[in-house]
Swiss-Prot record:
The keyword tRNA-binding does not apply. ATP binds at residues 87, 105-109, 516. This is Protein translocase subunit SecA. Its EC number is 7.4.2.8. Its cofactor is Zn(2+). GO terms for biological process: intracellular protein transmembrane transport; protein import; protein targeting; protein transport by the Sec complex. Keywords: ATP-binding, Cell inner membrane, Cell membrane, Cytoplasm, Membrane, Metal-binding, Nucleotide-binding, Protein transport, Translocase, Translocation, Transport, Zinc.
């Protein structure tokens, strides 16, 4: 009450902003006579003048009045349309990063030209975001004439365009495209292996058309790129046939004396950590076997750059054969390997071991080897659009969602007054007892309108409901057209003609958005056809166009006299905003119009929220069948129900965003690191830091900091340095031959040895050649580990709500454990990259260059790539649902904290999946 009282005295914030902006409108209007006197060339020259002023540091706000006046004048000359004052207000709201709510027919597309032109002067790019490809193409061509006239370039970003064309589109001053395509381009740019392959030029300023549809309706579902990595099915089978030729070594060897081995062999097993290590003899045996089967060249090493991937498959095959046993670790069911939880004995259907182990077990058992489909990259619209330096949006219906726009995106909603006051009559809802009665009443209304010639738009909430109306109208013999929001270009033509006298058009709520319904029909397409007809003389063209427009004026006045466009809806949507969008199709630019909702007590929304209450009223009034209840209290109770649903949906979206923000922070780190690697000319400092960290982590496992010599485990350290890092060091001899040596000196010796071995490789082929190889190794490892990390996060997210039963806050638990998973990801990248670079054997620059190219082509050879995007309703189409690759996470709790983790990572359980338990 007090708030309303103060608003009446001081005005709302919306009123105060409009008052402030109207002062600028006066300034813009004052410039109009001056710009009218300028020639075309003088107008174009203004653009260059503005660009130079911005480049010198002048703010866009200081140029705004002159720039808006220039665009208005250009539009008058090229488009034959003059911006209304309210469109100038809308343009200012968009420039200042707000959401402009402008009713249907108020000219949002033309309004956007003002801030688009102004912000394009900075040279940093402007992205105009539309809901479908048709609108992107239409608006780019339509408004592109104006931008080109003013000296700016325009690009269109469409799906399946060649990379060069996309790059050209993004290099333009202004780029038009769909929300999905901008998001997918961002993800693809963070999957490239060459800096010059990126298409986007930065995220400066975006104007989102139909902002409510994109940032709210489609915000529940992320954009997902998924696919299958390179197909190695034949290689898994071959490795399974070769590993029986390798013999297990028995006994533990002393690295100094060689004693302790009871039988020499090719590999040793560490059953506790589920790891396999090749011996020196094993490397020679593997090289001989690979050469005999044509997998490597005669005399080549398994650690040559081109052959390094073979070792990955060999280790997977050895682990599958010797460490994973049927009916203990897995069972075979229906031609599939199903993992057994070794603590509970339960089958873990749908889970798959990672790093090629599952495929190796499939090859061992002779079942079909399944190519694993993984999420390669993913982002929500909420997090993508928040990456822009400045974001704005426009729609006909945003005020009902103003709180969500402010809360999630930090966007203020500003209601722009119409150019002419609305004359639409929004009638009270009619509520019937049954659906049958509801449809019968709606059809009677449609027939009455058709008989008097009044055009009707029938709105439905689903394709199923539109088909019911279609059948009923066909039975009545009423001619009509049906739209279902799939064929955007055709729909735009039909919707444009829905205002003709006697027309009946059935449309789902989303169909034909972005196209005005003009009373009497739209003649612009016919006018364009006449203008394009070269067979006609100039005079004939003018005469035909004049006759066409005169005929349209007669039709227009006729339909206005009949009451304008009639909106008939057969169900309330769960969002008031969608209902308002439907109503907004009628009564554009001060035209007459009317709307009515026909409801049944068994409609979903009524049944759940308001059915019992309204039914009780009907029963008390003893209303006969076929009679409707029409009362303000009913309409208000329905709107109250809609508010409840909207609040619930907002809570869902906000909760999803809070979880996704965790992944988003990690995504930013990974993508930033990836871009730095792509752009860096020298990676030696990064690699050196990673190598030192790895050596420190390894040494500190066996030679703890500030520890006594008696606590050191030098034999195991020597063994691991030799088998995993190809570093042979006599650390025990060093200690025995020295009077006193500290743990830090041991660490320094290992670091120096690792640096010397690494520098020798670099010197052999040259720093420049080795840098490109380092880049490929880093990028490939980042991508592989990030894909596995996305799967791990998805698995963590699925079960995190159960923590609530343990009196823990699931959201906080998710943040904590996701951070730990991310730390492990960074550690794995560090270890894998360093290990590969330390063990690879290079002979020549040519060999290294070829290896880098092979790695790049392998990394990019993703099969069955699927692009999953939200549909118009914010739901994922079932046919495009991503099949997430999943990591093995044991669910038992009886493993010892200091035992090796059963997942096979080699880490202690408390440092690995024990953190997830």
């Amino acid at each position: 009450m007090a708030t309303n009282f103060l608003t009446k005295i001081f005005g709302s914030r919306n009123d105060r902003l409009l008052k402030q902006y109207r002062k600028t409108v006066v300034h813009i209007n004052a410039l109009e006579p001056e710009y009218e006197q300028m020639s075309h060339e003088q107008l174009r020259a203004k653009t260059q003048e503005f660009k130079e002023r911005v480049a010198r540091g002048e703010s866009l706000e200081s140029i705004l009045p002159a720039a808006f006046a220039l665009v208005r004048e250009g539009s008058k000359r090229i488009m034959k349309m003059r911006h209304f004052d309210v469109q100038l207000l809308g343009g200012m709201a968009l420039h200042f990063g707000k959401i402009a709510e402008m009713r249907t027919g108020e000219g949002k597309t033309l309004t956007a030209t003002l801030p688009v032109y102004l912000n394009a002067l900075s040279g940093k790019g402007v992205h105009v975001v539309t809901v479908n490809d048709y609108l992107a193409h239409r608006d780019a061509q339509w408004m592109g004439r104006l931008y080109n006239f003013l000296g700016l370039t325009v690009g269109i970003n469409l799906p399946n365009m060649p990379r060069a064309e996309k790059q050209a589109a993004y290099r333009a001053d202004i780029t038009y495209g769909t929300n999905n395509e901008y998001g997918f381009d961002y993800l693809r740019d963070n999957m490239v292996y060459e800096a010059q392959d990126r298409v986007q030029q930065g995220l400066n300023y975006a104007i989102v058309d139909e902002v409510d549809s994109i940032l709210i309706d489609e915000a529940r579902t992320p954009l997902i790129i998924s696919g299958q990595a390179e197909d190695h099915q034949a290689l898994y089978v071959t490795m399974n046939q070769l590993v029986p030729q390798l013999v297990r070594q028995e006994g533990e060897a002393d690295l100094r004396t060689g004693e302790g081995v009871t039988r020499l062999g090719d590999f040793t097993l560490d059953e506790k950590s589920h790891q396999v290590f090749l011996t020196e003899q094993g490397h020679e045996t593997a090289e001989r076997i690979f050469a005999s089967h044509g997998l490597i060249a005669e005399g080549a090493s398994v650690y040559d750059p081109a052959n390094i991937a073979l070792m990955h498959h060999l280790y997977a095959a050895l682990r599958a054969r010797h460490l994973y046993h049927r009916d203990q670790h897995y069972v075979v069911q229906n031609d599939e390997i199903v993992i057994v939880d070794e603590f509970t004995g339960r089958l873990m259907s749908g889970r798959r071991w990672s790093e090629g182990l599952h495929q190796a077990v499939e090859a061992k058992e002779g079942v079909t080897i399944q190519a694993e489909n993984q999420t390669l990259a993913s982002i929500t619209f909420q997090n993508y659009f928040r990456l822009y330096h400045k974001l704005a949006g426009m729609t006909g219906t945003a005020d009902t969602e103003a709180y969500e726009f402010q809360e999630i995106y930090g966007l203020e909603t500003m209601v722009i007054p119409p150019n002419r006051p609305s004359r639409r009559n929004d009638q009270l809802d009619l509520v019937y007892k049954t659906t049958r009665e509801k449809y019968a009443a709606a059809v009677m209304d449609i027939r009455a309108c058709h008989e008097r010639g009044q055009p009707v738009l029938v709105g439905t909430t689903s394709i199923e409901n539109s088909e019911i109306i279609d059948q009923l109208l066909s039975q009545e013999g009423l001619p009509h057209q049906v739209l279902n929001a799939k064929q955007h270009a055709r729909e735009a033509d039909i919707v444009a003609q829905a205002g003709r006298a006697g027309m009946i058009t059935i449309a789902t709520n989303m169909a034909g958005r972005g196209t005005d319904i003009v009373l009497g029909g739209n003649v612009e397409k016919d006018v364009a056809a006449i203008e394009a007809d070269t067979a006609l003389s100039e005079a004939e063209r003018a005469a035909r166009i004049s006759a066409l427009r005169a005929q349209w004026q007669i039709e227009h006045e006729k339909v206005k006299a009949l009451g304008g466009l009639r909106i008939i809806a057969t169900e309330r949507h769960e969002s008031r905003r969608i209902d308002n969008q439907l109503r907004g199709r009628s009564g554009r630019q001060g035209d007459p119009g009317s709307s009515r909702f026909y409801l049944g007590l068994d409609d979903a929304l009524m049944r759940i929220f308001a059915g019992e209450r309204v039914k009780a009223i009907m029963d008390r009034l003893k209303m006969p069948d076929g009679e409707a209840i029409e009362a303000g209290i009913v309409t208000r109770s329905i709107e109250s129900a809609q508010r409840k649903v909207e609040a619930r949906n907002f809570d869902i979206r906000k909760q999803l965003l809070e979880y996704d923000d965790v992944a988003n922070d990690q995504r930013k780190v990974i993508y930033q690191q990836r871009n730095e690697i792509l752009d860096a000319s020298d990676l030696s400092d990064l690699i050196a830091a990673m190598r030192e960290d790895c050596m420190t982590d390894l040494v500190r496992q066996y030679v703890p900091a500030e520890s006594m010599e008696e606590q050191w485990d030098l034999p195991t350290l020597e063994k691991r340095l030799a088998s995993e890092w190809q570093l042979t060091m006599a650390l025990q001899e060093l200690v025995q031959g020295a009077n006193a040596i500290t743990d830090d000196e041991i660490l320094d010796r290992v670091r120096q040895a690792a640096k010397a071995a690494f520098d020798a490789k670099v010197e052999q082929v040259g720093r420049e050649n080795f840098t490109q190889f380092e880049r490929m190794v880093l990028l490939q490892n980042f991508d592989t580990q990030w894909r596995d990390h996305l799967s791990a996060l998805d698995y963590l997210r699925q079960g995190i709500h159960l923590r609530g039963y343990a009196q823990k806050q699931p959201k906080q638990e998710y943040k904590r454990e996701a951070f730990e998973l991310f730390r492990q990801l960074i550690d794995r990248v560090k270890n894998e990259v360093t290990k590969l670079l330390m063990t690879v054997q290079v002979q020549s620059p040519t060999q290294l260059e070829q290896a880098a190219q092979d790695m790049e082509s392998r990394a990019e050879s993703i099969a069955n790539v699927t692009y999953t995007a939200p549909t118009d309703t914010g739901q994922v189409e079932a046919t495009l649902a991503a099949q997430m690759a999943e990591r093995p996470l044991p669910q038992g709790m009886r493993v010892g904290r200091n035992d090796r983790c059963p997942c096979g990572s080699g880490k202690k359980y408390k440092h690995c999946h024990g953190k997830l338990a």
